[in-house]
């Protein structure tokens, strides 16, 4: 039911309609797995036109709905929602919104994430079927030409694309399902005045899926083919498409076998004088039909028989009659009858007799009576001819549908299904007959389903579930359905059957009887009886039906003469089309057409009521099939009879989602920690309380849901989408947990491997460098004094100190500037000096860079030119050109490369000279000529040998050589026979724990227990419970939960480390209890000092002290100043070291036993001599020393903020015997006053102890 079936031309285009979101309509379909694209912010998102959901309208009225649809239609937005009911307006043109890119954008998305679209309805149906295991159906309604067939095809397209399945049988099923569209459209669709591709039959396609949501089969049920179209059409309409396809594009084989000619040659295809459809290529459509037959699996013989029947129908229509002398019908052209007999493979005489003579029998007393042959007049003969044609085509169409179902039979068990109903729309013509009555009756039944499932059922359910609800008034069309189908009181169909039974011989008499029966319906407010016609007030409007010919159309029975004719055929396919044998003795009235359509409609309703429905309401914007025309009046009429306004009101006042407590809990129990544990259902209460708990734990507001008697009602779809998103996220979180644990384990393994590798490299990686260092001793052969630093055990011959061989960094810049080839291996690089001779001045060392490769020696200069650094190779010497290397026997770093060329030999000063000699000997493969003597020889000019003398100078700097006037002054070095010291042992440090991966305790191996282990258990593990009203799954017995363990105290690292190296003597399953934790170590003691003299600060960074004050030592400097802090005020500052006496805390001794009580003694009497002695002592007190001249510089030292005052430690306090707890600045009493000599002795002993510790550290180094 689209606008057109195929554009003229070879390229096949989409038949869809709607706004395109992708510019390229011709993108090919991407096979394979769907590509998940990275989410991006849509900066170019188009602004919404109107409202995309009619429930968001500020004013609810038919006019407001019409205005919104018109606004969106004018901007190519043809889809609009009413909740999850989709309203579609046919634009009669292809806007390219059904491309693969657009389809992928709706994959896995809910309704609110994407704009309204038929793909969204298909996605929702497929998701609900797969997630909730409920059968789904999509009911597409609307009048003829509104786009129902197009919507059905797009739903099939989407489901076939997203349903997955890489198996060949599943793909074959998809292909066959899609192939049913062109096949059934060719045989079941036709051009009408309102629609170029109108479905003239009803189709319910049921897609069958397995448990994985993959299509495994399908089944098609067809309803009431309009077979009268085979023999006649009104002007500007066509017969079924297949007749024009066959007559225009039949291959020569069929033209020769079946005498196929152009459509103008046949009465059945030329009566309406309409042979073509604008924009439709019948030749290309016929190729699609043949291809679809092949995909379905029709053999060539089956296809030949199908087209044989089509040719027979066309030729039967060309049989003409004329009156003979008796006024009876006679065949005008016997050759046509002969060819029809050839096609049906019957005797031509039997064809002649069946079309012109009717056999009648008389009954006598229940026995068979006489048989009479009654000639037919021309009118009766034409009716018999047309009846034969209609019967052949009707049965042929049923056979095609059955053949398709046979190919689509499921090959594996079916779990669920999705049904798609594509049935003819409501029709109102100038002359409406029995066909329109049946079509409109079926649409009334569909409207009744919509009312029952969306309006009435929704309100009834709210009342039944005791939900707070405001009732909405609506029109229930059940009265119209009863008017047509009821038997008591008799309806239209009952009156029609009665008329056919009582006046079956004469069609005119039967029609008059039918009119008389209709008078009994005159009291019905939805019915009006008029002269020769009657009016039924349908939901879509009042329709006037003509009574003429209705009884004949309702009989729908083939004369026994015609049944005998086809029964005598020699073609087995004809017998397949007419399988029932003629029962001559059967006197029962066969079912009429109205009986069949009523039974089919009721079966369809029963099928739809078993599934979860989705609705698409199609609207036809105009009757002219014009692309941009919007007829406001026509659309407003459709809005009214479709009941969109009532649907919007109920949707806004109702609930978007409702589900029984059991299914709700089964779906969402994972979202609450109280109803699930590790994926198991653990709730022990009933389903209703479980649902309440889930909604509570997911923080759903109370106004967003209501609890009914058996169901939970969720008000807005956003809430449901939020629950679904949280449920999906639960599984993502579980997967992330597993992934995180695995990645932690991998990180732990990698970290352990890295540590082993690091240790191995540290142990063995330096061996090669040590070999090179030892080789340097062999190069010198004990002929040259050594520097002390060269003999350190930690010395390694690394070679490329400047990183010339590295990629990036300054080394690469030097390499590029010097032009060093990338193929050269860098053996050595270092900064040094080269002796430069200048005219008129003495030679002077100048900085250079020395680079040794496996082929050259480069002397690289760095020069500033216009404040720009320029790097260039000042001298490039091939190593093969070096004849000798000359150096002195002292420890200096000078040597010369004797080349003997036209340029002077370079005299170089390099601190890593021995390493250079070693690498140069390696590059020369041991052919290095190293000259060691008292003088260094080199060619200052070509052929002019010059010498540089090296002398020992005790006054020279120990680490720097001095060159002056061809003399090198150097200090005495180590003996030439010296060798390198052994490699020092690494300083003992605490083992660093492996913390990556979070698999070990925070302290690492032997460390404290993990945080998880020390944290008390929150609750015991709950037992899994069976889901409500479900069979309990067989599971392994789960042990009873153990009581939560009491957390153990965290042991100290020392004790834990010791425990980690202790082997457990018992291998039994019961472990011995852990030893009690050791006592906590005492707090670290703070270094303090006692002020010996008063000191007044002269600068802001110095600290004032008074004699007897006790201050805390923050740091000690070697320049005679200590950084101290006043323990009372927390003020820091510098104090002269000579003014302080460092205090050493006494070692605590065990408390002695209490002394015996002493006898009381008299208080001493103060004498005058005591005061005099004190005054004398004050006069004899030595003067304080002068502070160091070099005061501390605070500019380069970062200020240390004063720490907060800490509680005094009595073990460190110098006034520990003072129970009053002074500030430390008070004068010590006479019993604790130490002499100055004693304090200095204690300070010396402390210093000696500290120095001893430093020496130990050096040894460890």
Swiss-Prot record:
What InterPro entries does the database record attribute to this sequence? Answer: Fungal_myosin-I_SH3, Kinesin_motor_dom_sf, Myo1_CA, Myosin_head_motor_dom-like, Myosin_TH1, MYSc_Myo1, P-loop_NTPase, SH3-like_dom_sf
Q: Which residues form the IQ domain?
A: 732-752, 753-778
Q: Which residues carry this modification: Phosphoserine?
A: 370
All copies of the TH1 domain together span 786-973
Top-level division of the source organism's lineage: Eukaryota
SH3 domain residues: 1084-1145
In Swiss-Prot or TrEMBL terms, this protein is called Myosin-1
